[in-house]
């Protein structure tokens, strides 16, 4: 049998390189790229299975051409297992593993969320959001409900994965893009065009707090230590919030220069910002990883101090990332 050994120094950062149709596996022991693997066009997001073994990548498409596939990657063996064809379901973006065998994926062109059986490589459920640009997805802790952030409608959709039904759509603010479920079960939504963050009760979906968050708040990630992280693309910042009090603990201002805007998704819209978008945390909740789409770099941030402890490099226009506690084999 295969012995999977995990220690504090062995882990992998899986990075989707949007402009390169590839994924980089960064060995966090030494910070180097262990492997670069080909995906479909426009790999925008990636999520790792609970055991850390497999990464699932959404191939969103590029150049105005919507993709309709997922790439399954074996993290330990550093190889592509297979490509899953989504058929009529196009522009897959947000992705979360529901359990060992299934994953939930937003499909923007269809205004829906699909649940995919990974082994069979087929869609087993499709739930309509009836909203514009269903972009990111988060699951509640027991995996029974999914929340999609719908940029074009400024809302989230609450979807019951057990029944396959939409529970409701909740308007949060213009440009609702990032979504995360905190350790307290609250649903945090970043409204990029409104420059706000909305915190919703996870049972009633009433607004607990609306937080002013200027600078294009674009992604959210929850930590196991009771914090919620928000990246602000225009401001070039990472904000750390207290999940319980909703107060700001600190803002990390990144001093990283843009490499230039040509050919990049947001172009020169944010001036000299490095355009921090993707943000994830390690399993301890002590470190965050932030992808800077206009600087082709990932910052590792110590959340206790707010210090950037190292710079990691993957491919061109990194954005979606996932963390695995397993490390890739070296040949």
Regions found by a protein language model. Give the residues of each.
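Predominantly soluble domains enriched in secretory-pathway, periplasmic, or organellar proteins
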Residues: 3-331
């Amino acid at each position: 049998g295969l012995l999977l050994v995990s220690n504090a120094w062995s882990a992998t950062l899986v990075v989707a390189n949007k402009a390169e149709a590839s994924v980089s596996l960064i060995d966090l022991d030494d910070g180097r790229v262990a492997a670069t693997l080909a995906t479909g066009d426009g790999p925008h997001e990636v999520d790792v299975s609970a055991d850390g073994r497999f990464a699932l990548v959404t191939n969103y498409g590029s150049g105005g051409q919507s993709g309709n596939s997922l790439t399954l990657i074996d993290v330990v063996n550093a190889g592509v297992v297979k490509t899953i064809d989504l058929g009529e379901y196009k522009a897959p973006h947000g992705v979360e593993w529901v359990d060992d065998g299934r994953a939930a994926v937003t499909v923007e062109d269809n205004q829906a969320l699909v649940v995919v059986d990974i082994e069979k490589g087929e869609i087993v459920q499709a739930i309509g959001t009836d909203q514009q640009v269903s972009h990111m997805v988060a699951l509640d802790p027991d995996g029974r409900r999914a929340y999609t952030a719908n940029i074009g409608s400024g809302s989230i959709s609450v979807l019951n994965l057990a029944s396959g039904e939409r529970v409701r759509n909740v308007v949060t603010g213009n440009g609702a893009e990032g979504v995360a479920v905190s350790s307290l079960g609250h649903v945090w939504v970043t409204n990029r065009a409104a420059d706000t963050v909305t915190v919703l009760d996870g049972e009633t979906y009433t607004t607990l707090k609306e937080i002013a968050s200027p600078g294009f708040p674009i992604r959210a990630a929850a930590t196991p230590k009771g914090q919620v992280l928000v990246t602000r693309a225009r401001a070039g910042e990472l904000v750390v919030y207290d999940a319980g009090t909703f107060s700001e603990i600190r803002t990390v201002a990144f001093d990283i220069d843009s490499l230039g805007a040509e050919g990049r998704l947001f172009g020169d819209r944010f001036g000299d910002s490095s355009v921090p978008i993707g943000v994830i945390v390690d399993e301890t909740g002590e470190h965050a990883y932030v992808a800077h789409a206009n600087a082709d770099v990932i910052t590792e941030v110590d959340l206790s101090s707010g210090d950037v402890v190292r710079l990691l490099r993957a491919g061109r226009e990194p954005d979606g990332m996932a963390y695995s506690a397993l490390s890739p084999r070296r040949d």
